[in-house]
Amino acid sequence: IDLGIVDPRTMIKIDDTNIGIKEGKNAGLWTVGVARWSTYMNVLPENINNMNNVVIEERLEKSKEKLKQSKPDFIIETLDELPNIIETINIYNSENMNL
């Protein structure tokens, strides 16, 4: 299948696992790791209300540290941050810059 993609750096791989981030890096894509609700937080969204905020923050930090191992271009907590990341990527692409 030819998708007509000339430059893979115009695409973004968003994932919550190191395997997914590595897939994106191997394809030459920008990569974004999402920490909250990541597999590495080990919590279901429906159970979050029953958890202590300190525990949630500890798990979130551990999730970020785990995601850093795959060296994504960006790590965000939630997808709400994605528009800012896309804007940054567009600036880098327009100026032919890499991170």
What is each residue range found by the language model?
Residues 1-99:
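Asp-based, Mg2+/Mn2+-dependent phosphohydrolase catalytic module
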